Amino acid sequence: MPELPEVETMRRGIAGVAGCRIEGVEVPRTGLQPIQLAPALPVLRRRLTGQRIEAVDRLGKRVVLVLDSGQRLIIEPRMTGRVLLDEPPNRSHLRLVLRLSGGSQRQLLFWDVRGLGVVRLLTEEELSSQLGPRKLGPDALEISAEELRRRLSASRRPIKVALMDQQILAGIGNLYASEILHRAGLHPRLGCRRIGRSDWDVLIDSIREVLQEAIAAQGSTLSDGTYRNARNQAGGYQQRHRVYQRTGKPCLGCGRGEILRIVQAQRSTFFCPICQPRRRTSGKST
């Protein structure tokens, strides 16, 4: 599932559509179960056509087109969605096409193999109600160590599970939670209330470092190949994963531990028992 680095890469890749007008909205006939559109296509087409895209933003794991009407088009890739400028790998999984001003071939595409993505057109009031601060936590790249500590220090939940709670902080999913905790030297089962004050600083530094490095590498394209950037190119951060999907392999941090896999909240977690001891006594992993 695309997480913050992948969605931020998508956002940057399509940033050039700012200033374009939406001249047409199409949902290709594929014979597949359609993705969730809100409102329904006829209303969506009417409300979008003629709108100018003022900016391209990101909200957690969502791409946001800011329109001159004040409305926001929210594109949520979910498991396998891609936001593309170029032709997709195939047209059988092409779910939405926005025809743009600036040339007959200019378009913005949403392509999704599994069809779990969601596209919503929201007013400012609807955005605040559905994705405002009460529903979505601060962005993972912007939250401070003190704010993260305030939100989690009394929680009994394991830190790995808490990091993936989008109401606590937005953008981190299963992959980057494992990588961040390895960087910070924190065991994924460590209860939030047992994390020391100085360790919150280490954790927030690790969050920023891992996410920014992943963005610089244009995200992670895993073995299933589902994520690619707006030009349909693979990301490169998967080559730098220290723990994710490396069960049984030597730790790339300490060189002595063997990466273990456990299940938390029905998701796989990967960690090094040496770099991330259950009772933490040392600093961040190098």
Q: Where on the chain are the PLM-derived regions?
A:
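Structured catalytic/nucleic-acid-binding cores of DNA maintenance enzymes
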Residues: 1-286
